[in-house]
């Protein structure tokens, strides 16, 4: 069956679901991808990610060029116009094709009477583009982040906040993790070169490789056989700090989708690993990852605040707590985060993190290691969280990562490096 859906209208619907209904793009996009031909999937993804990355700018332009916002049943048209702006500003789609296809999108969303309006706004933008962009360059919207997040970053990083924002607005590099049970990193890099691709090793994380140019996973040597996994370099730091050993009982808490679970088992194939996550649906991806890599772990659904429900009285040699967080360190990878999070979420997340930490600490054996990690850059979830935990937990000591006054290691997103990530390694006295 030939797939004939209008890409621009699908992108507009996806962005509307994210911004208006708070759905994540990772949930919204896959069903829409099924509606388009394989050759068009990359463009649909580019339009969705791109519009969400630059949403502040596109919204600003609409407010300049339209006297009143589109509301109610016409709201999708608002996002369709954004898709048009994005193509004209950021893609290599020829302007005449961008205009024609975007205008035609009105028919696909059953608003053919608005074709003239869409065409008029996009043509007006083309005529005024230089003037508008000069004005935009001095507006608050130029940071492409919600105001509350800009303020938090300015407060937390007085000299680095612009670097963080610029990094968040870039396209992310593609990092891989070589499965050391199959190949050395250098050995796999040789296979990659034989396949006509180039990769670069990370200086600190022994399994990490950055592709010179992102590629589909099926093109990677041995991906289906489990020789390599897509995982950001910073996420690989979790297993480095955890340093799992064969024969140990290890808890991976908040484990989905299973990237860190499988990394633990690559480092320590004889470890006994329990992977727990609250989200039953996302646990299916843990099973998928274990299966592709040919590994075994115990996988359970459970709430980190109530360990008795999923592990009884069991104690562990090592615990990895990749805590639920604002994900403000991975915005370049998931631009919808900027529009899904709210300022009030941060205090709620910090409270949840503290509850999980307090609940699982008694499950760590004396002398054991707990690595607390987040993909956040906000101190409330990171340094402040660990500082207060150490103050109220006399048998916890910091190891390798920072000082009691400035606990943990904070990686900031940037360039070809890894995502924004925080780690604190704690030892039980």
UniProtKB/Swiss-Prot annotation:
It is found in: Cytoplasm. One of its GO terms (molecular function) is rRNA (cytosine-C5-)-methyltransferase activity. Keywords: Cytoplasm, Methyltransferase, RNA-binding, rRNA processing, S-adenosyl-L-methionine, Transferase. It catalyses: cytidine(967) in 16S rRNA + S-adenosyl-L-methionine = 5-methylcytidine(967) in 16S rRNA + S-adenosyl-L-homocysteine + H(+). It is an enzyme of class 2 (transferase). S-adenosyl-L-methionine binds at residues 254-260, 277, 303, 322. This is Ribosomal RNA small subunit methyltransferase B.
């Amino acid at each position: 069956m030939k797939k004939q859906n209008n890409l621009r209208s699908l992108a507009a619907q996806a962005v509307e679901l994210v911004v208006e209904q708070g759905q994540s793009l990772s949930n919204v996009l896959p069903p829409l991808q099924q509606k388009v031909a394989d050759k068009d999937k990359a463009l649909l993804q580019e339009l969705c990610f791109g519009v969400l990355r630059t949403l502040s700018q596109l919204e600003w332009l609409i407010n300049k060029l339209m006297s009143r916002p589109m509301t109610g049943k016409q709201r999708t048209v608002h996002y369709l116009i954004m898709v048009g702006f994005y193509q004209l500003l950021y893609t290599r789609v020829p302007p005449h094709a961008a205009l024609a296809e975007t205008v035609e999108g009105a028919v696909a969303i059953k608003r053919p009477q608005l074709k003239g309006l869409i065409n008029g706004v996009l043509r007006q933008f083309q005529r005024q583009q230089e003037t508008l962009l000069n004005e935009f360059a001095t507006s608050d919207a130029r940071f492409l982040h919600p105001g509350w997040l800009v303020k938090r970053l300015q407060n937390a990083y007085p000299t680095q906040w612009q670097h963080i924002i610029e990094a968040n607005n870039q396209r992310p590099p593609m990092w891989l993790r070589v499965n050391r049970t199959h190949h050395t990193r250098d050995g796999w890099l040789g296979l990659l070169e034989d396949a006509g691709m180039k990769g670069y090793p990370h200086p600190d994380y022994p399994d990490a490789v950055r592709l010179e140019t992102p590629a589909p996973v099926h093109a990677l040597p041995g991906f289906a056989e489990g020789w390599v996994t897509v995982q950001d370099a910073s996420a690989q730091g979790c297993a480095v700090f955890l340093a799992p050993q064969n024969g140990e009982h290890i808890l991976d808490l908040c484990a989905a989708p299973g990237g860190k679970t499988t990394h633990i088992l690559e480092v320590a194939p004889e470890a006994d690993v329990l992977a727990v996550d609250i989200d039953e649906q996302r646990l299916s991806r843990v099973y998928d990852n274990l299966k592709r890599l040919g590994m075994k772990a115990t996988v359970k659904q459970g709430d980190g605040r109530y360990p008795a429900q999923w592990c009884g009285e069991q104690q562990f040699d090592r615990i990895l707590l990749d805590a639920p967080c604002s994900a403000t360190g991975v915005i370049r990878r998931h631009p919808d985060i900027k529009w899904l999070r709210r300022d009030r979420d941060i205090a709620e997340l910090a409270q949840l993190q503290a509850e999980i930490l307090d609940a699982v600490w008694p499950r760590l054996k004396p002398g054991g290691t707990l690595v607390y990690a987040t993909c956040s850059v906000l101190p409330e979830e990171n340094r402040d969280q660990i500082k207060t935990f150490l103050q109220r937990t006399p048998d916890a000591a910091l190891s390798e990562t920072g000082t009691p006054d400035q606990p943990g290691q904070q990686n900031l997103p940037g360039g070809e490096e890894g995502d924004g990530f925080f780690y604190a390694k704690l030892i039980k006295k």
